[in-house]
Amino acid sequence: MPKSRKNGNAVYAADAVQKDDRKRKIASGAGVLAIGSVIAKMLGALYRIPLTNILGAQGMGMYQLIFPVYALFMVLSTAGIPTALSRIVAEKRATGQPSKKYFAAAMLALALLGGICSVLTFALAKVFAVWQGNPDTYYGFLVISPAIFLVGIISGFRGFFQGEMYMLPTALSNVIEQVVKLALGITLSYLLIGKGLIWAVCGALLGVVCSELVTLVYMVTTYFVRAVKARKNGVREIRERMTKQEVKSMAAMAFPIAIVAILMPLSNFFDSMIIVNMLRLHGESGDVATAWYGLLSGPVQSLVNMPIVAIISLGVAIVPSVSASRATRDVDSIMLKSRLCVKLCYLLGIPFAFFFAVYADNILSVVYPSLNQNSLNIAANLLKISAFNVVTFSAMQIYVSLLQALDKTKWAVLSLVCAITVKTVLSLVLVRFTGIYGGAIASVSMGALALLISNAAYFKICGLHLEKNVGTNLVIGVIMALSGVGVKALLQNPVAAFCVGSVVCVVVYVWLVFLFGLVSREEIPHLPMKRLMWGLHRLIRFWDYG
């Protein structure tokens, strides 16, 4: 008896060690994926700065007319299959069952969908160009169409590797994709700008195609190297075909994922069809309408997206642990982690929004020196309006992620569908009668409405509001903005005002946040840069440590 008990304890201990190892591997893989995603998104946002300086407002308008159509067909070509594949592979791997048949079926479906979407983009290029109100974009659609097929195949490899808990290829492929696009796209557009604007735009789009091709080569190489190593280690998998039931199950899993994924690209697609045409009805020429659309969707949106990417990356890093807490029905843990996600959005989003509103003209003149004074003035006004999207879009997307983590995807879909519908109607009306600023107002309205609905949905599910102290946070943001206005009035040089104002605003905001206790001692261990947070908390709220 003692011997069997001892053996039982040993087996139990071994199982516990294996579970701990698995958890550590998942956490490590998620960390690698998050880092790669942040780097890739930041590179993607930075890419548009030199591109705008080369293409100018009108060229950027052409580029931004083409890209939403490309993004929409890119989502349609994947249809949620990669995410469904990663889940199925992870499940089969955990139970020791073969998963290659799912990978083969997914790759076949992705190749077919990608091929169809690429051909449709190529065939309908003229139609899209006419609908958008700028016939010159026709050539851009022809150039970008092969990338849709390549993206579909790449996404299949990414889904498979993620299901295998091997996150490095996905993280590296994201970075490779952006680096090649940045280097080649900027180089080609610079070399071709002398031949004409559409040539330079096509050069940038060719850079996108080449980046996807290089990424695909990397993913294929990684897959076969891994397969060869597995064979050398004696790992072989029996080839089987999927049953009809398995195909239906995979499709059912992919469908809701695809619905959520397609909504934002669909909104941008509507913008590309509406804004230029409404501006022309407003009385602007085709070139001016394209240039103004380029200012809104290019330099302005790029600046707004930078803090949104950073904020969402920090917040979403906490979201997987919300799913884990839901599995254990730990309500207190769910509320703590959810509140922290949302608090990060407001703590970081509010100062960025006010800073953009105060220093819009300074930022744009420093970052986009090639824009003429009229374009800078229009872009500055657009940025002052769009600055509020930093708060609403980041918080809205965190709420959507939290709802998905709680298996309430239908509420996420409802909030986005309602918001996109309102934005589309407002764009049709406001841009037609007020000009390009109507497009910015419609975008802000969309973010605000989606945030309100998703917030209400979360309250309905959990019974608690998450965003305490938002009023105090807004007051602190106003004080920070006033200090920025003071610096701007004292320093006439835009570069000096921007640099000094940045430092003053950061110091004032951080000091007031800790002074008013918006970050508690209990929350600091869960925040990024914990040591720095502790140091600032001790320095500013020294009486708490007496």
Regions found by a protein language model. Give the residues of each.
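Interfacial/gating helices of multi-pass transporter permease domains
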Residues: T52-L72, L197, V201-L205, Q245-M253, ...
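Hydrophobic transmembrane helix module of multi-pass membrane transport proteins
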Residues: G114-L266
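Membrane-interface junctions at transmembrane-helix termini in multi-pass inner-membrane proteins
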Residues: V151-S173, F388-C418, V429, F433
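Membrane-interface helix-loop junctions in multi-pass transport and translocation proteins
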Residues: L168-P169, V179-V217, T222, K410, ...
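Helix-loop junctions and terminal segments of transmembrane helices
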Residues: A79-A94, I308-D332, V400
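Membrane-proximal transmembrane or re-entrant/amphipathic helices at the cytosolic face
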Residues: P2-A13, A489-G546
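Interfacial segments at transmembrane-helix termini and the short loops linking adjacent helices
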Residues: K126-V143, F356-V390
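Signature of the first transmembrane helix
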Residues: P2-R5, N9-V11, K25-T83, G115-S118, ...
